[in-house]
Amino acid sequence: MDEIQDIEGLTRRALQAISRIDTLRDLTKLKNDNLGSTSWLAKYSASIKILSQEKKPIIGKAVSEARRKILEACQDRDLALRLNAQNEQFTRETLDITALPTRIFPGARHPIHVLQDKILDFFLMRGWSVVEGPELESEWLNFDALNIGPFHPAREESDTIFAEPRSASMLLRTHTSPVQLRALVSNPLPLYCVSSGKVFRSDPLDATHTPVFHQLEGLVCDRNITLGHLKGTVEDLAGYLFGAEVNLRMRCNYFPFTEPSAEFDISRDGIDWTEWGGCGLVNSKVLSMAGIDTVHYTGFAFGFGLERTLQFIHSLSDMRDIVEGDIRFSQQFGLK
C-alpha cells in the first residue's frame, strides 16, 4: 500500500533527524512536528475513520508503530542530551581537591574539656590514677554511703533529679563523691586518685549556676594522712592553674562526708575572694562503709567545679556564656 510506504518513509526520516539533534529545544520542536496535533501522524490518524474496513487495521497498526518508534527515539535522545549537558557542566566545574584552601574554619575543643585535661595531667604526672563512675547513680552511693542522712535537704526533689520509677532509688548524681566509694572498694591501698565528670542539680540557669556542670574531685587514702597533706595538694594545684601569685585560704565548714571540713577560696589581690571548692579529711564513717581499717588508714578529699574555675582563670562574670554556645564567646578559645 502507498500509505504504508509513506508512513515508513516519514518514520525513517524522523528517526534520522532525531539522531542528529544537538539541543533539547530542537528536539522538542521535532517531536511536535512528528507527534503533535498538526503533525503528519495526526493527519494519518484522522484519516483512518474514512478508510475501508480492510485498510483501517493495517493503517492503524502502522500509525501506532510509527508513533511508538518516534516517541522512544525522542525519549532516548532527550536522556542522551541531558547526560551530555551534565557531563559538560561537571567538566567546567571540576575542583582540584588537592589545592590548598584559601580559608580555614578551624574548630576547637570546649574550654571546659581543655581545663579538665590540664588538671588531670597535673595529677597523673604526680602518680595519681584517674577513676570514673556512672552519671546515673544509686541513691545509696550518692547519699547514704557518704554519711548524708535520710532527712538531709540535699535529698529533696527540689535539689536532686530522681529517675523514674522513684522506687528504684536511682538519680542523676549530684556530685562526683560517689566515685570515692567505688574507688575505695575496688582498689588496693594506698590510694591516690582523681575523678571528673558531669553532675546534675535542680538549679535554674543563671550567672552563677547551671543545672548540669562539671566537678573534679581528688581522694587520698593512706597511712598518717593529715590536713597538711591536703592543704599542700590544693596549694600546688592552685599555683599550677592560676600562677604562683594566687592567694589561697581555707575556712572551716561542714560536709557530712569529711571531718574536719573546710572550704577553700582564691584571690589575686588578697582582698576579693572567690569560693573555689570544699575539702576535708574523709569521715571515718565513709571509710568504714568501704571496708577500710580506720585505725591504720586516714584520707583526705577535695572537690570543685570546673565552670567556676574557668570563670576565675578568664575573668568571666556569667556562667551562662560557657554553656549557651554563643560564637562571640567561643572565638576567644580558638573557634572561628
From Swiss-Prot:
Record lineage: Bacteria, Bacillati, Actinomycetota, Actinomycetes, Micrococcales
Protein's name in the database: Phenylalanine--tRNA ligase alpha subunit
Assigned GO CC terms: cytoplasm
Xref: Gene3D superfamilies: Bira Bifunctional Protein, Domain 2
MF (Gene Ontology): ATP binding; magnesium ion binding; phenylalanine-tRNA ligase activity; tRNA binding
Co-factor binding comment: Binds 2 magnesium ions per tetramer.
Broadest EC class assigned to this enzyme: ligase
Record's keyword terms, sorted: Aminoacyl-tRNA synthetase, ATP-binding, Cytoplasm, Ligase, Magnesium, Metal-binding, Nucleotide-binding, Protein biosynthesis
Catalytic activity reported: tRNA(Phe) + L-phenylalanine + ATP = L-phenylalanyl-tRNA(Phe) + AMP + diphosphate + H(+)
Binding sites annotated in the UniProt record for Mg(2+): 259
A Pfam family recorded for this sequence: Phe_tRNA-synt_N
Assembly and interaction partners: Tetramer of two alpha and two beta subunits.
PROSITE patterns membership: AA_TRNA_LIGASE_II
